[in-house]
């Protein structure tokens, strides 16, 4: 069930003059060869900003995919948005596994709670280092994705091997 790196989605579906499109997108999906060893990594999930339907379903699907399809056994939920990374807020993380998210798709809101507003990017990356997080999934809207981008820039600046992934949600 792996997707080959050779699989592409053409930018232009139809060409009238018979020319081949030069532009294509990489097809999404699981790859046979991946950068991280899933059995050795710790993943993190955070939800930020306003709530919208389906957030718990996204959390559940992430946990199930990471656990069952990739073999990731250490998944942390960071509570109350980006505040969850800042020690002075004293928010505890939540261990996520298939049992803990089994029925969350039937519950409204976010099991991780949420918050709005920026936090210190340096402190967030410090927390990722302390907790040995190698993949961080940020679920949120424009502000969250801007924050995820800033986190990724700081990770790159420090030359860390942490993947920052943005999952858009909005109403």
PLM regions with names:
Residues 152-171:
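Short, acidic/small-residue loops that bind anionic groups at enzyme active sites
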Residues 2-36, 85-136, 144-145, 167, ...:
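Glycine-rich oxoanion-binding loops at beta->alpha junctions
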Residues 46-47, 77-79, 113, 138-140, ...:
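Short beta-strand segments
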Residues 60-64, 93, 129, 152-156:
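Short, solvent-exposed amphipathic alpha-helical segments in soluble enzyme
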Residues 72, 108, 161-162:
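A generic structural signal for alpha->beta connector loops
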Residues 33-86:
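N-terminal phosphate-binding or glycine-rich loops at protein starts, especially the Walker A/P-loop
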Residues 52-62, 85-86, 119-124, 141-150:
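Short glycine/serine/threonine-rich phosphate/pyrophosphate-binding segments
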């Amino acid at each position: 069930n792996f997707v080959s790196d050779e699989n592409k989605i053409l930018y232009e579906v139809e060409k009238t003059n018979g020319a081949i499109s030069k532009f294509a997108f990489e097809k999404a999906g699981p790859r046979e060869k991946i950068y991280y060893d899933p059995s050795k990594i710790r993943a993190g999930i955070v939800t930020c900003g306003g709530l919208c339907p389906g957030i718990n379903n996204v959390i559940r699907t992430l946990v199930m995919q990471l656990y069952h399809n990739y073999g990731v056994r250490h998944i942390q939920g960071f509570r109350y948005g980006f505040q969850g990374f800042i020690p002075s807020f004293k928010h505890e993380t939540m261990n996520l596994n298939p049992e803990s998210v089994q029925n969350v798709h039937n519950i409204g809101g976010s099991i991780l709670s949420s918050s709005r507003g920026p936090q210190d990017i340096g402190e967030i990356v410090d927390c990722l280092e302390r907790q040995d997080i190698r993949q961080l999934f940020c679920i949120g809207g424009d502000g969250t994705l801007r924050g995820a981008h800033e986190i990724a820039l700081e990770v790159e600046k420090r030359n860390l091997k942490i993947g920052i992934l943005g999952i858009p949600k909005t109403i």
